[in-house]
Amino acid sequence: MKKIECIIMDWAGTAVDYGCFAPVAAFIKAFAGKGLTIDVEQTRKPMGLPKIQHIRELLTMPEVNEQFINRYRRAWTEEDVVELNHLFEKYLFASLKEYTDPIPGVIPTLEKLRAEGLKIGSTTGYTREMMDVVLPEAQAKGYRVDYCATPNLLPAGRPAPYMIFENLTKLAVPDPDTVVKVGDTIADIQEGVHAKVWSVGVVLGSNEMALTEEETHALPAAELENRIAEVKQRMLAAGASYVIRSIEELPALIQLINSKLNH
């Protein structure tokens, strides 16, 4: 009888850092350091990609590209990308520890699944050096994974599937049908689709919702439901197998997937 053997979790916006805020401020400050203005919506759009690729995507946006040309009288180059990445890393490392609190519900949910024998892997848009900060902080707060793959040591990060493949190899999981990838960005969903695993989006606490926990609780019920529905649609349009409101719904979803695997 086939059943789900492995959950692969994203990090910021899925497991820790409610609303995925750590990278946002660092990107905005980095671009400001080069005299360029980007807003929160632009900053969040490529979220989930490797951070250096995220910078390329921001520079490619027509309004940002135009700003760059107007300011520097030339097209941007890979040297500019590297310079922006250095600035981004400087600002991110200065605040990263503050953004490692596990999202409510994550620890009990994942521990319940682990107790049932599931392996817990993870992928991220953060580099290994960034995860060297995040992993011990999250673990000290009660959240741990069995493996963490980072994009900088592989042929490509998201939306390519290599980080998932590395998890499957390291955790000895041979069948992608028995794997659920959980994430909060469009890049997360695409990563799962490309790896041919069950790709699940989670809405509350996500980059796509772009709200703090306090802002989420303060929203009128009807507006909250509308926002959740919008995010769900975006995730399904990107190819999500399922979308759940919060991580607490994951065990029930796994039961549903298990029943489908055996019909």
From Swiss-Prot:
Reactions catalysed according to its record: phosphonoacetaldehyde + H2O = acetaldehyde + phosphate + H(+)
Pfam name, any one: Hydrolase
Enzyme class: hydrolase
Residues annotated as catalytic: D10, K51
Keywords: Hydrolase, Magnesium, Metal-binding, Schiff base
Required cofactor(s): Mg(2+)
CDD domains on file: HAD_PHN
GO biological process assignments: DNA repair; organic phosphonate catabolic process
A GO term for molecular function: magnesium ion binding
InterPro entries the record matches: HAD-like_hydrolase_sf, HAD-like_sf, HAD_sf, PGP-like_dom2, Phosphonoacetald_hydro
One annotated Gene Ontology cellular component of this protein: cytosol
Cofactor note: Binds 1 Mg(2+) ion per subunit.
Binding site for Mg(2+): D10, A12, D184
EC id: 3.11.1.1
Sequence similarity: Belongs to the HAD-like hydrolase superfamily. PhnX family.
Quaternary structure note: Homodimer.
Chain's role: Involved in phosphonate degradation.
Stored PANTHER family: PHOSPHOGLYCOLATE PHOSPHATASE, PHOSPHONOACETALDEHYDE HYDROLASE
Protein name stated in the entry: Phosphonoacetaldehyde hydrolase
